[in-house]
Amino acid sequence: QIKDTELEKCWKMNDIVSIKRFFIVKVNDYNDYENRVRDCFPHLVFHEEAFKFVDELGKCSDVIEELTRHLIILNDVGKKLYDYHNKNEREVLLELSSGYDLVCSGKGSNEEKRFNKEINYKDQRYQLTCNPHTKLYKKRTDKRIYFCWGRDEIEGHNIIIVRIGGHWQE
């Protein structure tokens, strides 16, 4: 169950979005969840393949609240923190960890390459760098949400959710 204090911290949106978020944690199917996310997280952009590996998280009903908590925080404060810290990823990830109890990291110490993904947006192709990710529940887990801090050309530089699932391996 998502704690009320976390909801109060994150739900600064209008009542309609709050109500939609209340009901999205009750779905038992990732397809249903995917069909609802854009209404619940209006400040996030979801890559067309964001949910391609979501089954790697395990049973939907077991992870839905934690997944939703992460998306709420990224939607409600992620971009604001990124702008506040002048695009300093390290500072933003530290604040997300300490202030919002969101386990996250950027490029790992053993990662030689960047994780890149292309996105089509309004008949244009863009290359995204997707190293930052949150980790569901604990620091040492393969359950992750990979994202990009956004691009000016795509919906006002909103965070782009690129991959939800296990550890990204190319």
Task: Enumerate the predicted regions with their spans.
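Basic, Lys/Arg-enriched alpha-helical interface segments
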Residues: 1-142, 150-170
